[in-house]
């Protein structure tokens, strides 16, 4: 049986964090942010990033984990957030995933794994796209898509 993870999703400033904190206090949980902007250090204004007062002593994960100049992908998020979830579960606590970035939430909950691509691989794909065009790459993608 899969471990329990509580997910709260919705638009920015809709009360997700306040609800997550209340539930964490009630159920013995910790909050894992699923917001594509709250991961960045210094991006507090306009992201509704919770203040220490709003956190009310509840541990929050995946806040301020990257510099705004860094590349940050859904794959990187899923690896880091999965480690947070595993750690929370290992301590007998409830992970409460709260945020509005559906791409992050969907991939985290689905447990998707992502391959690591080197710069060389990207260069090869870009060269092929220039030479053969994007339709050729699209056709290759269809070979690996089960519902195409």
Give each language-model segment a name.
Residues 1-146:
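Phosphate/pyrophosphate-binding catalytic cores of soluble transferases and nucleic-acid-acting enzymes
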């Amino acid at each position: 049986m899969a471990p329990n993870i509580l997910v709260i999703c919705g638009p920015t400033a809709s009360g997700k964090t306040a609800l997550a904190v209340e539930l964490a206090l009630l159920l013995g949980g910790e909050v894992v942010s699923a917001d594509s902007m709250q991961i960045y250090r210094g991006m507090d204004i306009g992201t509704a990033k919770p203040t220490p007062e709003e956190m009310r002593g509840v541990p929050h994960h995946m806040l301020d984990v990257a510099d705004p100049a860094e590349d940050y992908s859904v794959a990187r998020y899923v690896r880091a957030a999965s480690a947070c979830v595993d750690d929370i579960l290992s301590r007998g606590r409830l992970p409460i995933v709260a945020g509005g970035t559906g791409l992050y939430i969907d991939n985290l909950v689905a447990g998707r794994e992502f391959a690591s691509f080197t710069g060389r691989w990207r260069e090869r794909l870009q060269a092929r796209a220039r030479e053969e065009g994007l339709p050729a790459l699209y056709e290759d993608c269809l070979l690996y898509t089960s519902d195409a």
